[in-house]
Amino acid sequence: MDPTRVMAVWSRLGGSALGRRLFSMMLGWGVPYSGSIGARVTQLAPGTCELVLPDRRRVHNHLNSIHAIALINLAELASGLAMLSGLPPTARGIVTHIEMDYEKKARGMLTARSTACAPGLIDCDMQHTVEAEIFDAEGDRVAVGRILWQVGPKPEVQA
């Protein structure tokens, strides 16, 4: 996922509900596993992201709540968009570790929020932790994820 391209597409589409839906669909096509839960991007700016996840049967577990892995997927996507949107075009990131705390059964429309303070100069690989919080419609925090990103320069393309 090229951060510059993601932000350029968002700047064209993020201003309307239809555009945000189209952006979210395009993101799902580009990142199929993350797209499998059907989350929608509602806010995106360098270093910050907000997603919503409608409560649908396909993301439920046997307890009629949203499955733990769907919550991890949502947290990772929010942290990734927040992190990558703040990186320079010469950098890239990949998840190396995820921790998730589940605080309440997740039911109803969920909102995931993440803020990342991207490292300044990226001239070597480094570890960077980004937190993503997930809230239910009542505003109660249902889960929080801590996602460890390895951030580094993109390899130079040999001609």
Put a short name on every predicted segment.
Residues 1-16, 106-107, 117-159:
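HotDog/MaoC-like acyl-thioester-processing domains
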Residues 54-79:
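Hot-dog-fold acyl-thioester-processing enzymes
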Residues 37, 47-49, 94-98, 108-110, ...:
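A generic structural signal for short beta-strands and their flanking turns/coil linkers
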Residues 81-117:
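Hydrophobic beta-strand-centered segment that forms part of the acyl-chain substrate-binding groove
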